[in-house]
């Protein structure tokens, strides 16, 4: 990918945080489902 290396590093840091948030969301949803909690 071409571009300013500082911008690319910053974007990589941001996407890392977004992926971590997604993983945490999925882990919690499975944990709640295992506990028998439902959305309804």
Curated annotation (Swiss-Prot):
PROSITE patterns: FERRITIN_LIKE. GO terms for molecular function: ferric iron binding. One of its GO terms (biological process) is iron ion transport. It comes from the Eukaryota. InterPro entries: Bacterioferritin, Ferritin-like, Ferritin-like_diiron, Ferritin-like_SF. Keywords: Iron, Iron storage, Metal-binding. The keyword Metal-binding applies. Transmembrane segments: none annotated. Fe cation binds at residue 18. The keyword Cell membrane does not apply. Residues 1-40 form the Ferritin-like diiron domain. Oligomer consisting of two types of subunits: light chain and heavy chain. May perform analogous functions in iron detoxification and storage to that of animal ferritins. Contains approximately 750 iron atoms per molecule. Belongs to the bacterioferritin family. This is Bacterioferritin heavy chain.
